[in-house]
Swiss-Prot record:
A GO CC term attached to the entry: endoplasmic reticulum membrane
Name of the protein described by the UniProt record: Divergent protein kinase domain 1B
Lineage: Eukaryota, Metazoa, Chordata, Craniata, Vertebrata
Lumenal side: 52-431
Gene: DIPK1B
Membrane-topology annotation of the record: Single-pass type II membrane protein
Disulfide pattern: 57-94, 62-117
Amino acid sequence: MRRLRRLAHLVLFCPFSKRLQGRLPGLRVRCIFLAWLGVFAGSWLVYVHYSSYSERCRGHVCQVVICDQYRKGIISGSVCQDLCELHMVEWRTCLSVAPGQQVYSGLWRDKDVTIKCGIEETLDSKARSDAAPRRELVLFDKPTRGTSIKEFREMTLSFLKANLGDLPSLPALVGQVLLMADFNKDNRVSLAEAKSVWALLQRNEFLLLLSLQEKEHASRLLGYCGDLYLTEGVPHGAWHAAALPPLLRPLLPPALQGALQQWLGPAWPWRAKIAIGLLEFVEELFHGSYGTFYMCETTLANVGYTATYDFKMADLQQVAPEATVRRFLQGRRCEHSTDCTYGRDCRAPCDRLMRQCKGDLIQPNLAKVCALLRGYLLPGAPADLREELGTQLRTCTTLSGLASQVEAHHSLVLSHLKTLLWKKISNTKYS
């Protein structure tokens, strides 16, 4: 006990010599004040972090609500039994950034998975007691009893046309939706199966996953229960989280965070491989089977990579179909182009005369991605590559004009960038 008291005295009253303390009588008081201020500030940070965590991370609520409706026979799905009866879905780390969209890493049948579930309807504290009935009424209200399979097919086709555009490939996508709904392969779609698939289609990211299932760089869909779904896990998560503790991130200025990411993140050749994958993903979004898609929040936070440094788009929430963006922007009232913004950075020009937004975006996906890559690839780049890489990235970043009118130049710049990076890492262990 004597040693503990001595240690506390040294911490609280500062390890200065008695002579110095005698010369500066106010120093002891200041040290006590600063020590307790540090304790208070640390306690406050811990409190804020964990109160924020409890609000953002509500996976238990999601599971309770989903399983309640599964047991009532309202919903169905390929992972319902494993989730609610066999308890084979293990919820691990919370990755949610907003309360309404729950994201967890997990384990299912010995596979690393990402678990995603929306709980917007349950977050109102006044309505928590009747959370399950509200989701039954609000989210799982369609199709209604008595709907034929033909009517459900037409209903699905109409929904996809509204969100992806009137494309000749949509009937094939409707076929995929119906095959997915019939998860037990009994050649019929029950009302619970139809309600579950319809609810999933209302989730923007699920619609994108379905549209991009054939693409190499989108996460693969593994199963669902109601509007909860599992995708393959992304072992190394997003770039922004590279070994930075959650409590430390808000305290560090962006410049210092960037420096730490370069120091703690992958070696430059691995970063080049990830960047090539991101550029290939930009190609996949441009005039694919189900139309063109826009990246409307172009940040490294949405990007992930596998254990072998193959790029995977970890979060598709802010990727939007061209038809959806056009519908949002066309005819919208505006004073400046900033009023014509979908998501974070999908911006269209403002017609000052008509005071209405136009439907075409100003900046293509590639220009926004290249702006990210300048900060990610140039630091630590090989000396013999840095100048040419910097020039090409600057050229790419300045791509302008309406996104629908830069196709040829877009493809040429993208091809040059991929070739430059690939030549540097090909025939090495990094390729």
